[in-house]
Structure formats: C-alpha cells, structure tokens
Amino acid sequence: MAREIVLDTETTGLDPRTGHRLIEIACIELEDLLPTGRSFHRYMHPDREIDPDAQRVHGISLAFLADKPRFNHPDVAEAFLEFVGDSPLVAHNAPFDRGFINHELERAKLAPLHEARWIDTLPLAQKRFPGMHNSLDALCKRYKISLADREKHGALIDTRLLAAVYLELRGGRERGLDLTVKAQRGTEAVIAAVAYGPRPRPLAPRSTDAERAAHAEFIGGVLKDKAIWRRFGV
C-alpha cells in the first residue's frame, strides 16, 4: 500500500528567514489515500513573540505555549522524523511548510526534508480549477467538505480537511469508495469461509422422533403431490 503523510503547520509569522518560527505541526498518515487513524501533533515554544496578524489567523497565544517544548526536543523533532519516515509529504502551498520545517531542522542540526518528497496540493487544485480561488477553505466549500468544526485555522483540523481535499483531487470519493468496497469484499470472503465451512462437530437434531414422524405423515398424507417442491422434481 502507498503511504503518504498529510501535514500542516502554524507559525509566528510569514518567513523563517526573518526569524519567524514554528509553533504547531500536525500530520495524518494515509494508506492508498485513506486515513489510517495514525497522527502526529505537537505545539512548540518559539522563543519569540507571535505577530498579531498570525495570531488572528490561528488563535495561538504565547501564554498558551509557555509550557510547551522547543522544536529541538526529542519528543518533537526526532518524533516527527520517525513518524514521517521516508514517505511523501502532502501540504497545501508546500513551500511555506517546507521552509519552516527545514529551518527548524537545520537549527536542530538535523537533515532537511528534500524538496522531491513534497506533493503540493495548491498546483494540483490550480490545474483542476484554473482561474479560481484555490485556498483550503475554497476547496472545502467546492467539494462540500464541512468546515463546521473549525473556528480558526489550526494545524490538526486543517490537516484533516486537507486529507479530504487531497482525496478529491486525486480522483474523488469514488476511488476511496472502491478501496473500501475491496476491503469489505475481502472481509466478506473471510466471513463466508467461516459461515459455510464444515462444522468440526455436527449439530444435534432439534426435533424429536415423534415430531419428525408427524411431519412425514403430513407431507405424505395431506400435501402429497401439491407440495411446491414436487414441481422441481425434489
């Protein structure tokens, strides 16, 4: 099965080259485009102020991050790298997320994530919907993906939304449904094998000798040739 990681980040501002930092990162694991239920999510203290414009977007305050670890903590940087492994990384406007993540990895003296690993859903959307607005919100509305659970932008909820959008961009729910049906058919085959296989011990008769004799008398004496199964030579 093809494993991919959908991810999103929140930051203190727009550009790591001017000193801005990561404050949240979230990932969801996909197998053949469908979420497996495995995820990674961390908040990080940035050691700097958060720009007011950025805070209005994601709602994360420095006070909230006061007790959160730095990115270079093993439970953040190393755990993140272990989770993503060598799988392709899916992001919306990937250069933004890649720039911040690689900036943090380099600060932690860890190898950056190569550009070739990244799948950017923004150009995919622009190719499918040329000349249209292709933000994550716009794509969710276009594909009728509910935004009801999201009050502000956040890495975890945005990653879940992006996973649904990515499925649509790669062929839609029909493809996901086909995969689900295949899995269901496989399960049904196992159930059928169990249901119709030979019993290790035959069931004991559930009718008495007297009941079986009365049934035979009814069939032979009352129904005779009127029994419906006689029409089929049974």
Describe the role of every protein-language-model region.
Residues P88-A91, P95, F100, E104-L105, ...:
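Acidic, Mg2+-coordinating catalytic module of metal-dependent nucleases/exonucleases
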Residues M1-A116, Q126-P130, A138-K152:
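Conserved non-catalytic scaffold segment of RNase H-like nuclease domains
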Residues V76-A79, V165, F218:
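A ubiquitous structural signal for well-ordered alpha-helices
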